């Protein structure tokens, strides 16, 4: 049975959501892993605490060999939309003992930290979560959502709220990054002979009209498939960055 098949059921089982915040790219020493589930203690654990459950710490969840500690948090707005816009969720975490405020001060509000949301079911959790083990443990059964911290929105003594963005939004990219037309994208972006897309480094020179020239300073690619073939040869692999078939389409 797979997670996808479970989600098709009327009662898929107990859902588990785990969070990880990775700021190692800008100097954080550890990945922060946490969950917001209230997991009951066993009678044996309560008895060992002298019958006072308040003496027991909140229980961690182990997933894929990593410990996710209990920490009050919630995420809103991660649902997909139908209008083509990317979601911009809000992650709210408890500011216990001002610990999150301290992280914000130390690491520039955790901007661009990678936030990964793991969704799975309790029956797939690591065996060490269960006193008797777990024969259905399967670390591959999860759904991932990845965002990056784009801004710190609210900060109080109780909570800190972060605005998340998709990786594409954070980098300011637009869709599509390439247009479908018959001209070479590398040429249009002035990347002829740069090695970034266009790797031509030969000694065949042509002007913008595809006429052969001896002076390298007159060498200019016009971005056509013909220009690419003249330089690389008809029988060689071409790094052409266009879509020749689009020239057959007429509006």
Swiss-Prot record:
Coiled coil: none annotated. Pfam families: Phage_tail_L. InterPro entries: Phage_lambda_L. Keywords: 4Fe-4S, Host cytoplasm, Iron, Iron-sulfur, Late protein, Metal-binding, Viral genome ejection through host cell envelope, Viral long flexible tail ejection system, Viral penetration into host cytoplasm, Viral release from host cell, Viral tail assembly, Viral tail protein, Virion, Virus entry into host cell. GO terms for biological process: symbiont genome ejection through host cell envelope, long flexible tail mechanism; viral tail assembly. Its cofactor is [4Fe-4S] cluster. Binds 1 [4Fe-4S] cluster. One of its GO terms (molecular function) is 4 iron, 4 sulfur cluster binding. It is found in: Virion; Host cytoplasm. GO terms for cellular component: host cell cytoplasm; virus tail. [4Fe-4S] cluster binds at residues 184, 198, 221, 228. Its main location: virion. Part of the distal tail tip complex which plays a role in DNA injection during entry, and in tail assembly initiation during exit. The tail tip complex is assembled successively with three tail central fiber proteins J, one tail tip protein I, one tail tip protein L and one tail tip protein K. The tail tip complex interacts with tail measure protein to initiate tail tube assembly. The formation of the tail tip complex is completed by the addition of tail tip protein M, which is followed by tail tube polymerization. Belongs to the lambda-like tail tip protein L family. The C-terminus coordinates an iron-sulfur cluster. This is Tail tip protein L.
């Amino acid at each position: 049975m797979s997670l996808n098949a479970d989600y098709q059921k009327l009662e898929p089982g107990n859902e588990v959501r785990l969070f990880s915040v990775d700021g190692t790219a800008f100097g954080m020493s550890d990945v922060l892993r946490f969950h917001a589930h209230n997991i009951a203690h066993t009678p044996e654990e309560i008895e060992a605490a002298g019958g006072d459950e308040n003496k027991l710490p909140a229980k961690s969840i182990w997933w894929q060999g990593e410990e996710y500690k209990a920490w009050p948090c919630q995420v809103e707005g991660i649902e997909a939309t139908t209008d083509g816009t990317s979601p911009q969720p809000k992650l709210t975490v408890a500011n216990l003992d001002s610990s999150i405020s301290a992280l914000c001060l130390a690491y520039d509000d955790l901007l661009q930290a990678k936030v990964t949301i793991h969704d799975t079911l309790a029956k797939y959790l690591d065996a060490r979560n269960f006193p008797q083990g777990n024969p259905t443990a399967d670390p591959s059964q999860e759904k991932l959502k990845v965002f990056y911290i784009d801004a710190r929105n609210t900060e109080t003594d109780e909570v800190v709220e972060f605005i998340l963005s998709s990786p594409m939004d954070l980098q300011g990219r637009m869709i599509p990054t390439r247009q479908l037309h018959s001209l070479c994208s590398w040429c249009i972006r002035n990347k002829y002979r740069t090695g970034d897309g266009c790797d031509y480094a030969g000694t065949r020179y042509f002007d913008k009209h595809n006429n052969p020239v001896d002076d390298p300073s007159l060498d200019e690619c016009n971005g056509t498939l013909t220009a690419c073939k003249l330089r690389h040869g008809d029988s060689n692999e071409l790094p052409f960055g266009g879509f020749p078939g689009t020239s057959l389409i007429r509006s």
